[in-house]
A protein has these predicted regions:
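A bilobed periplasmic-binding-protein/Venus flytrap-type ligand-binding module shared by bacterial periplasmic
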Residues: 70-82, 181-198, 213
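Short gly/pro-enriched beta-turn/loop segments at secondary-structure junctions
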Residues: 180-181, 222
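Secondary-structure end/capping motifs
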Residues: 197-304
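Short, conserved secondary-structure transition motifs
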Residues: 136-142
Length: 324
């Protein structure tokens, strides 16, 4: 939305947006300098800095882009088999000789963390009772439809596509699993943040203003129409609308009010503070992708989650005044 609203230009920036296939590709392109900045899962900056699954590359974030936005989707076949919630899923798993397969978008993303939390809360061991596989978000629904997955945890609109097609149904929304969890951040290399500090702060300021725009209910239709365009999410408008207008359709007649399904600005969403960093680290440790918490010191966490950059961007935005 920052590009569509000319917010980058307002802050003197020329920005080119690139769509990428998956989160690992985005991480690698940041590491090797093919991208200057990226919309990325909150755990990615920590993982890149520590060299978890990649070359160690110090990265930072000065902006959390949103909270929540995900759901756990199960296949329609599981519904036909009698699954209605986590408890009945656990019972069915106990009768199967082969483990069920569930998709997550990235090893270091909230989707992996949230699905594991939901499974554990329902007495299902994510490492022994089921099989978790990494699949790019846009390919989740196709794999569910083809029968390769029994379920997945992913962001919208990939859950709503399953509901609309009656190939799947949602059993949980992410805010019910971990209230106010950080979702995506703006990720850059540390050397970019240092060497091009004025540009970086301006970038954060432009995106912060865009986040505020997206959070206003009266702007949601414009956001939906923009996301539906081929160069962006390229998904049906009705699928995008299902989670963006204050309610959420879980499927099979269950429609509930969810005003906080997507939070882009309110509730202190945008500050990359210590609480959000701690949640990500806790989830990384619990999921096993961070083998030893002592690998990362408190000072390193502060170098990654940069409230100083966020504060500078807020000051710049306040000085310029809102334009939308």
């Amino acid at each position: 939305m920052a590009l569509e609203l000319a917010l980058f230009a307002r802050f003197g920036l020329e920005v080119e947006l690139n769509r990428e296939v998956g989160w690992a590709t985005i991480r690698d392109k940041i590491i090797y300098g093919e991208l200057d900045a990226a919309h990325a899962p909150a755990g990615t900056a920590i993982a890149a800095t520590l060299g978890l699954g990649c070359i160690p590359t110090p990265c930072v974030t000065g902006l959390v882009l949103n909270l929540h936005g995900n759901a756990v989707t199960l296949s329609e076949q599981l519904w036909r088999d009698g699954v209605r919630d986590g408890g009945t899923l656990r019972e069915l798993i106990g009768t199967r000789a082969e483990p069920m397969t569930f998709g997550v978008a990235f090893q270091f993303s909230s989707h992996n963390f949230l699905l594991r939390c939901w499974l554990r809360a329902n007495g299902i061991d994510p490492d022994r009772d089921v099989r978790l596989v990494v699949i790019p978000p846009a390919q989740m629904f196709a794999n569910l439809e083809a029968g390769h997955l029994d379920g997945y945890c992913v962001g919208e609109p990939w859950n709503s596509l399953a509901v609309l097609s009656r190939r799947g149904w949602c059993v949980a929304a992410s805010e019910d699993i971990a209230r106010n969890h950080p979702e995506k951040v703006l990720m850059v290399r540390e050397d970019f943040a240092e060497e091009r500090a004025p540009e970086h702060v301006a970038l954060v300021a432009a995106l912060l203003e865009a986040c505020r725009f997206c959070d206003q209910p009266e702007n949601r239709e414009r956001v939906i129409e923009t996301l539906a365009l081929p160069e962006y999410v390229n998904a049906p408008i009705h699928a995008l609308r299902m989670s963006m207008c204050g309610s959420f359709d879980f499927g099979h007649g269950r429609i509930e009010k969810y005003p906080d399904f997507n939070v882009f600005s309110r509730n202190g969403a945008n500050e990359p503070d210590a609480r959000k960093a701690a949640w990500v680290l806790d989830m990384m440790e619990r999921s096993g992708v961070l083998p030893d918490r002592s690998l990362i010191s408190a000072s390193t966490v502060q170098r990654i989650f940069r409230t100083d950059i966020y504060d500078s961007a807020r000051t710049l935005l306040a000085a310029r005044g809102a334009s939308i």
